[in-house]
């Protein structure tokens, strides 16, 4: 009976502490962080990948345009 009373008293002390001091706060914050990360991976990851692909394609087009201009200048200088 003494153990049960001690357990209940200590539980009350922990629960009456400020939420920032409680261990449960850290667990809750971790769960929220994991949830946000999963959500970002599922929804935002696709958009980020599409944006990176579009940027890569644009860079490739710019490189091809520069090479084409360089080739035309060299050809004009040779003729």
From Swiss-Prot:
Cleavable signal peptide: 1-22
Tissue-level expression: Expressed in mast cells in gill, skin and gut, and in lining blood vessels in the viscera. Also in intestine, spleen, anterior kidney, and blood cells.
Subcellular location: Secreted
Cross-referenced InterPro entries: Antimicrobial12 (IPR012515)
Modified residues (Glycine amide): 44
Cellular compartments per GO CC: extracellular region
Broad class of where this protein is predominantly found: secreted
One GO BP annotation of this record: defense response to fungus
Compositional bias per record (Low complexity), positions renumbered to this chain: 52-69
Function: Antimicrobial peptide with broad-spectrum activity against Gram-positive and Gram-negative bacteria as well as against a variety of fungi. Rapidly inactivates channel catfish herpesvirus (ED(50)=4 uM) and frog virus 3 (ED(50)=13 uM) over a wide temperature range. Seems to disrupt the membranes by adopting an alpha helical conformation and forming toroidal pores. Has hemolytic activity.
Family: Belongs to the pleurocidin family.
The protein's name in its UniProt record: Moronecidin
Organism: Morone saxatilis (Striped bass)
